[in-house]
């Protein structure tokens, strides 16, 4: 018997044990996020928004894979930082490295649960950073940390729900955008 067969049998045994005790089952819809490195989880959130808004007409969308600095995606010149986290053992989404910067307009928090996606969009200028954990103050990291429970976020199931959330929070009027584009023609 080769080592791969033995190793796979052990993986199966452990996976069955984990499936009995964890909310993250091997069969969960979004279990694959747990296999990604932390920075690649961020890429998942950024690319998800890219693909959601690339199907939206009459908007200007800017996204470049990798680190653009203080924002990740731009919609009609509104700069958005994307923070993606998965549900932890305490039933929270932990978001790290949050920056208080004038060079970005919003933060989109994407929470990935085993079988659900959640979002929350916050305008940076309206965040009370004094209520967040400043990781830099104690030398435990950089930026701020902000945790959310599922109840503090909005569950999203469709592309249209995400678009509606963004338009409402960013103050964009889809009909007005279309009207302005038609008047320029």
Where do the language-model regions lie?
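Nucleic-acid endonuclease domains
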Residues: 1-78, 83-185
